[in-house]
Amino acid sequence: MIWDTDSIIQAYAQGYFLMSDEEGTLGWYTSSQRTLIPLDDRFRYPKSLQRVLNQERFTVAINRDFPAVCWGCANRETTWISHELIEIYLQLNQAGWAFSFETWQGNQLAGGILGIAIRGAFIGESMFYNIPDGSKVAMVKLVEHLRARGFVLFDAQLQNPHLARFGSYGISDREYKLLLRKALSSKCHLI
């Protein structure tokens, strides 16, 4: 199937997201309960992570190695990121919609977050790490970056225990669409 970039972005702007099922078939999904990462003072992280941040062991980059972040996010026993979806992410990256927010330790990719930025909305697709704390530092630094750029929404799509450590919270689909509309009316740029 050929996926048109404009149609993909329009669907994300309406609250849908792409996922592959267990057979690798790509489809559009939505959720009645959406998970957000707070961009206000509700954002938090473990105190042990503050020590890591203070040590400045990681540097941060955007799109330094976008393909590696895609493959890092997909490289797990059970994944919803198929080869076809990686090709779509690469296409969206080339068009200026998909981004990787990365942490590095020297020349080694430590971790990263893959997402789609549409005006004031950042839709986080996945995250991974190669070095312990790499993705956690990426999360903290991404939130700082989104705040500095005036983003309204950091959509994490689905809740999990890891995201809960950062203060993630759920909202109804109706609330989500109202917030998404507000985010889409903002003129923000990730880079």
Swiss-Prot record:
Compartment(s) where it occurs, according to its Swiss-Prot or TrEMBL record: Cytoplasm
GO molecular function: leucyl-tRNA--protein transferase activity
Catalytic activity from the UniProt record: N-terminal L-lysyl-[protein] + L-leucyl-tRNA(Leu) = N-terminal L-leucyl-L-lysyl-[protein] + tRNA(Leu) + H(+); N-terminal L-arginyl-[protein] + L-leucyl-tRNA(Leu) = N-terminal L-leucyl-L-arginyl-[protein] + tRNA(Leu) + H(+); L-phenylalanyl-tRNA(Phe) + an N-terminal L-alpha-aminoacyl-[protein] = an N-terminal L-phenylalanyl-L-alpha-aminoacyl-[protein] + tRNA(Phe)
Keywords: Acyltransferase, Cytoplasm, Transferase
GO CC, any one term: cytoplasm
EC class of the enzyme, as a word: transferase
Location (main, coarse): cytoplasm
GO biological process terms held by the UniProt record: protein catabolic process
InterPro entries for the chain: Acyl_CoA_acyltransferase, Leu/Phe-tRNA_Trfase, Leu/Phe-tRNA_Trfase_C
Listed EC numbers: 2.3.2.6
Domain of life: Bacteria
One Pfam family of this chain: Leu_Phe_trans
Family stated for the protein in its record: Belongs to the L/F-transferase family.
Function: Functions in the N-end rule pathway of protein degradation where it conjugates Leu, Phe and, less efficiently, Met from aminoacyl-tRNAs to the N-termini of proteins containing an N-terminal arginine or lysine.
HAMAP family: Leu_Phe_trans
Entries under PANTHER family matching the protein: LEUCYL/PHENYLALANYL-TRNA--PROTEIN TRANSFERASE, LEUCYL_PHENYLALANYL-TRNA--PROTEIN TRANSFERASE
Protein name: Leucyl/phenylalanyl-tRNA--protein transferase
Provenance organism: Gloeothece citriformis (strain PCC 7424)
Gene name of the encoded protein: aat
